[in-house]
UniProtKB/Swiss-Prot annotation:
Any Gene Ontology CC annotation: ribosome
Family assignment from sequence similarity: Belongs to the bacterial ribosomal protein bL9 family.
Annotated protein name in UniProt: Large ribosomal subunit protein bL9
Single Gene Ontology MF annotation: structural constituent of ribosome
Key word Ribonucleoprotein present: yes
A family per Pfam: Ribosomal_L9_C
Keywords per UniProt: Ribonucleoprotein, Ribosomal protein, RNA-binding, rRNA-binding
Functional summary from the UniProt entry: Binds to the 23S rRNA.
Record's keyword annotation contains Chaperone: no
Domain of life according to the entry: Bacteria
Database matches in PROSITE patterns: RIBOSOMAL_L9
InterPro entries, sorted: Ribosomal_bL9, Ribosomal_bL9/RNase_H1_N, Ribosomal_bL9_bac/chp, Ribosomal_bL9_C, Ribosomal_bL9_C_sf, Ribosomal_bL9_N, Ribosomal_bL9_N_sf
NCBIfam families reported in the protein's UniProt record: L9 (TIGR00158)
Amino acid sequence: MKLILTAEVEHLGVAGDTVEVKDGYGRNYLLPRGLAIVATRGAQRQADDIRRAQELKGVKGLEHARELKTAIEALESVELSVKTAGDSGKLFGSVTAADVVSAIKKAGGPNLEKRTVDLPKAHIKSTGTHPITVRLHPDVNAALSLNVVAG
């Protein structure tokens, strides 16, 4: 059975690929879950259009990611004031990715999604300077330092 994938399927391909699979696998797994459509001429044309649009979007996304990287790295260091800190520098609570995003925005940086921020550990639990990585695109990462201070 010839199918066009509508989503990435492990060990089979990515969206837009035309694949040949056994009838049962296609009928009982791929088609009911919406992971593929039956390959016809019209569906093939539609898949080609989608693939071209994704390639153009990827190029625009890469250029935009590079612009964001220069804006973020121009900040160099971002300061985050935390009210709940002990005398030894340990925080009562933790600094999350959402806190980092709001600190970057307050410092004059771009508005980011919290899922793009990679913290050194799951959460920051002490004052001081911590390295932060922001994933803007699969090929573009921006690095900056976050200075957590007791306030």
